[in-house]
Structures are given as structure tokens and as C-alpha cells.
From Swiss-Prot:
It is an enzyme of class 2 (transferase). This is Hydroxyethylthiazole kinase 1. Belongs to the Thz kinase family. Its EC number is 2.7.1.50. It holds the Pfam family HK.
Length: 259
């Protein structure tokens, strides 16, 4: 989908949300024209997965008792043919590493969205990180490609240089918007936004369109303010009015294809 399709069809994006950023995530999904829905209740997963167009699983505040829940949700989505996006927040922390390993063994995932440090974990590449922010340096293209090949998922690596790869075909967007890293929840929001863009089909360009839309909106917002509070509001405003022609021009000018 592109932004025009989303506003016309209003896909329902179901997010298994953490309890830190759900309102911001819902606002981002809503302002682009999609319909956000949050749930952490196992009893309704089958019904909600049935009506959703995409399912996002965010492990930012995952607890041990919830591991089987996210596996079940991903299985329900898979059986119904709904794309699943995994946001493995701080996956290199031992408890989270174990939980995600268990999830990958028994659950289902179509897209993994994370920062460079998080994606490097899936690629078995050492990468310095601190909390939710990646601070190490490495070849992000290689990291994304290796992670895609190891997991079988499309990888969406976000940061100063965004990379989307299925292991064979890779796209990059090398434009840094520093203000996006000043707000807690931009990664969470991007993961759910990707869900809206892949609601009618999982393709690398669809995932990149989501990332380009988010980064272009951030770039526009940054020209108007660099204060985190006002930037948050301006980002939502830019996403609300962003035009598909602007996004496609941005993609043509800034996105590079690799293989």
C-alpha cells in the first residue's frame, strides 16, 4: 500500500503493545488513515486477528507469562494469512534473547523491525548497544541481509540509515533525522506503521515506503522545531497531511536499490 491506499482502505492494525508508548503508536497509525487497535488479551486474539489486516508484536515490556501469548497471537495471524511484524525491543538483554529465541522457534514472523543493535542480534553479529538506542557502528546493509537470511523474515533496520532486506533484494535510505531519536516510541510507532503499509502484501518496497513516509514526515517536522515536545506534535501533523506524490519523489531521490 501507499499512503493514498491507506487513507482509502483504512486497514486495521492490531498491536500487541508495550505499556510505555501505546497512545503515541495509536496516534501515528490513526493520523495516516489506518485504524489502530491495541490488545494484550489472549482470549480475544483469534477474533481480533480475524478482523485485523496486520498484526504487530512489540516486546518492549514483555513478561515471562506473556511469551506463550505472543506465540499464540502470531500463530493465529499466520493461519489467517495476516502479516506479522515483530519489534524485538532490546533483544540482546538475556531474558529477552531467550524469549525471542523461543518465539522464533514456535511462532511466526514476516517482518522484524529494529535498530542496528537489535537486528545485529538476529544476524549473530557483535554490535554495541545501550538500552533501546544503538550506539555501535557496523555495516548495516550486511547486518540486515544476514539477519534476513537467518530468520527468513523481511528485515526493517531503522536508524540514521534505514535498510530493508529480504536477504536478496535490499533498499537503503541514508538520511538521518536526529530528532526522531529524541522521542521515546518512534521505533514502536514505525513498526505499527509498517503494518499498515503491508496490509495488502508483503514486499520490500512496501516496507520501505512506510519507513520513507515516517522519515520524510520527521524531516519536515524538524524544519519547524527541534524541541522534543513540539516535534512530537509536529510529526503527527506532518504524517496527517503527507502526500503520496511527495513520498514517491522522496523515495526516487533518496532510496537506493541493492540487488
Amino acid at each position: 500500500m501507499n499512503i493514498t491506499d491507506i487513507r482509502t482502505k483504512s486497514p486495521l492494525v492490531l498491536t500487541y503493545a508495550n505499556f510505555v508508548t501505546p497512545q503515541f503508536v495509536a496516534n501515528v497509525v490513526n493520523v495516516v488513515g489506518a485504524s489502530p487497535l491495541m490488545s494484550r488479551e489472549l482470549a480475544e486474539f483469534k477474533e481480533l486477528a480475524g478482523i485485523a489486516n496486520a498484526v504487530i508484536i512489540n516486546t518492549g515490556t514483555l513478561q515471562k507469562v506473556e511469551i506463550n501469548d505472543i506465540i499464540k497471537l502470531s500463530q493465529e495471524a499466520y493461519q489467517l494469512g495476516k502479516p506479522v511484524v515483530l519489534d524485538p525491543v532490546a533483544v540482546s538483554v538475556p531474558f529477552r534473547s531467550k524469549a525471542i529465541t523461543q518465539f522464533l522457534a514456535s511462532g511466526h514472523v514476516d517482518v522484524i523491525r529494529g535498530n542496528a543493535a537489535e537486528i545485529a542480534w538476529f544476524a549473530d553479529i557483535d554490535f554495541a548497544s545501550q538500552g533501546i538506542d544503538a550506539t555501535g557502528k557496523g555495516d548495516v546493509i550486511e547486518i540486515a541481509q544476514r539477519a534476513a537470511k537467518k530468520t527468513g523474515a523481511v528485515i526493517a533496520l531503522s536508524g540514521a540509515c534505514d535498510v530493508v532486506s529480504d536477504g536478496q533484494y535490499t533498499q537503503t535510505l541514508d538520511i538521518n533525522v536526529e530528532q526522531l531519536s529524541s522521542i521515546v516510541g518512534t521505533g514502536d510507532a514505525l513498526s505499527s506503521l509498517i503494518g499498515a503499509f503491508i496490509a495488502d502484501g508483503l514486499k520490500v518496497p512496501n516496507v520501505m515506503n512506510a519507513m520513507a513516509t515516517f522519515k520524510l514526515a520527521g524531516q519536515k517536522a524538524a524544519t519547524k522545531t527541534n524541541q522534543p515536545g513540539s516535534f512530537t506534535n509536529q510529526l503527527l501533523d506532518e504524517l496527517f497531511v503527507i502526500d503520496n506524490i511527495d513520498v514517491q519523489n522522496f523515495v526516487k531521490e533518496s532510496v537506493l536499490n541493492h540487488g
